[in-house]
Amino acid sequence: MIPGEYILSSESLTGNVGREAKTIEIINTGDRPVQIGSHFHFAEVNPSISFDRSEGYGFRLDIPSGTAVRLEPGDARTVNLVAIGGDRIVAGFRDLVDGPLEDLKVNVWEGREDDWRRSSAAGDAPQELPQVEAAERGRKLDEATDVGTEDTPEEGQN
């Protein structure tokens, strides 16, 4: 074997065998292109992607790992979804679930987009992002980058 050499099988691989799968129609109703990654919890994709969000709950795109689907403004497409595997705990993304999928599916997707935000499984999900003026953000950034640069007394001085 040569260092760094890949030895690949000539047999084709089939992923996601035995997992629940479904096909849904989606459309980008926004004015910007949107990309959806292979392992993104589909119910939490960009709000400009129009579809029945409850159909995407607990699912991700059925595409190879590390790839994405791109929709230009106005694009409509049929996508294949596959159930999220493993421990089925969704964390991050748009922070709409943030916990075990099976414990949280209680009309989470009813109502308008504004009503989706809810407490995380730990109860610590922010309800609203604070609005900070640009000048304030700049000052906070300056303070954060000055760590360890303040004048300190020389050794032996008070």
Curated annotation (Swiss-Prot):
<comment type="similarity">
    <text>Belongs to the urease beta subunit family.</text>
</comment>
<feature type="region of interest" description="Disordered">
    <location>
        <begin position="113"/>
        <end position="158"/>
    </location>
</feature>
<comment type="subunit">
    <text>Heterotrimer of UreA (gamma), UreB (beta) and UreC (alpha) subunits. Three heterotrimers associate to form the active enzyme.</text>
</comment>
<dbReference type="GO" id="GO:0009039">
    <property type="term" value="F:urease activity"/>
</dbReference>
<feature type="compositionally biased region" description="Basic and acidic residues">
    <location>
        <begin position="134"/>
        <end position="143"/>
    </location>
</feature>
<protein>
    <recommendedName>
        <fullName>Urease subunit beta</fullName>
        <ecNumber>3.5.1.5</ecNumber>
    </recommendedName>
</protein>
<dbReference type="InterPro" id="IPR002019">
    <property type="entry name" value="Urease_beta-like"/>
</dbReference>
<dbReference type="InterPro" id="IPR036461">
    <property type="entry name" value="Urease_betasu_sf"/>
</dbReference>
<dbReference type="GO" id="GO:0043419">
    <property type="term" value="P:urea catabolic process"/>
</dbReference>
<keyword id="KW-0378">Hydrolase</keyword>
<feature type="compositionally biased region" description="Acidic residues">
    <location>
        <begin position="144"/>
        <end position="158"/>
    </location>
</feature>
<comment type="pathway">
    <text>Nitrogen metabolism; urea degradation; CO(2) and NH(3) from urea (urease route): step 1/1.</text>
</comment>
<dbReference type="Pfam" id="PF00699">
    <property type="entry name" value="Urease_beta"/>
</dbReference>
<keyword id="KW-0963">Cytoplasm</keyword>
<dbReference type="InterPro" id="IPR050069">
    <property type="entry name" value="Urease_subunit"/>
</dbReference>
<dbReference type="GO" id="GO:0035550">
    <property type="term" value="C:urease complex"/>
</dbReference>
